[in-house]
């Protein structure tokens, strides 16, 4: 099994399934690919149906996208309890994960993961008055507070025990 990821210092999308697979106890190799040059982009398009990372090569199949890889791991390694056991907590963990996967655009655009990222630095620092970032941060505080208040008694993570939701919010 091979997880193909983007640059480890910069790719939050790649970090998420790597964390999930590690937490599941999966044995896998990791290959880091870059996509700066046209040749690198062409190689990535050859490897990935979507042309993006991450992707998981397993049993002759290619699974792409952070959420798909994470769901595959939850089904493949049920003993790892990658989603909360409680049905309500599980549904809300999936909702929070999907929201991070598809939302928080200003946060992801303006607040990169790595300090050495080409888009980081004083010139790219978000202005405190950025309305999109303000909305994203306010939503993040509400979301985390609600999940911890409702489900956090069992441990230090968003839903008490570690879950895929924690992997998706780790880069934040």
Regions found by a protein language model. Name each.
Residues 100, 104-172:
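GST-like fold's C-terminal all-alpha helical module
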């Amino acid at each position: 099994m091979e997880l193909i990821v983007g640059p480890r210092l910069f790719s939050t999308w790649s970090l998420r399934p790597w964390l999930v697979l590690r937490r599941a106890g999966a044995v896998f190799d990791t290959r880091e690919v870059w996509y700066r040059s046209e040749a690198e982009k062409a190689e990535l398009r050859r490897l990935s149906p979507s042309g993006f990372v991450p992707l998981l090569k397993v049993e002759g199949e290619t699974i792409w996208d952070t959420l798909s890889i994470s769901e595959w791991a939850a089904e493949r390694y049920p003993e790892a309890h990658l989603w909360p056991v409680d049905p309500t907590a599980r549904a809300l963990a999936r909702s929070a994960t999907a929201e991070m996967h598809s939302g928080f655009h200003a946060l992801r655009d303006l607040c990169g993961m790595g300090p050495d990222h080409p888009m980081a630095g004083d010139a790219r620092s978000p202005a405190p008055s950025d309305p999109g970032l303000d909305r994203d941060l306010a939503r993040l505080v509400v979301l985390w507070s609600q999940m911890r208040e409702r489900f956090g008694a069992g441990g230090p993570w968003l839903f008490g025990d570690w879950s895929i939701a924690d992997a998706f919010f780790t880069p934040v």
